[in-house]
């Protein structure tokens, strides 16, 4: 267990991360979610990460109350990621201990957390599966 206590996000994160642009359509995002086994994508504007978009953000587009008219499906899929993304997002840096990452995931019910370097550039992403791998590695000693 001691190994897990010392492990960092940088040691277990996925370094090659797929991102989406702010002007990606919901239709394109839907195809990406179908093709990949990801819960969320960092949203980029140039080299900067300006938010995240998750399955939950995508699904919120389709939640309506009886007072609102339901827009056409094609109209919803034509919306841009910028319209539904979460611009205020939680992230960690590569030196963040996995114990802290795990606590953030539990507290905020997150499946993955972007990892940004000192210049706030995307360094990777760490998912629940990465935490599980670290725990398994630690148990093996």
Task: Give each language-model segment a name.
Residues 28, 49-50, 61:
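Short active-site-adjacent helix-start/loop capping segments
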Residues 14, 37-38:
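A short helix-to-beta-strand capping loop
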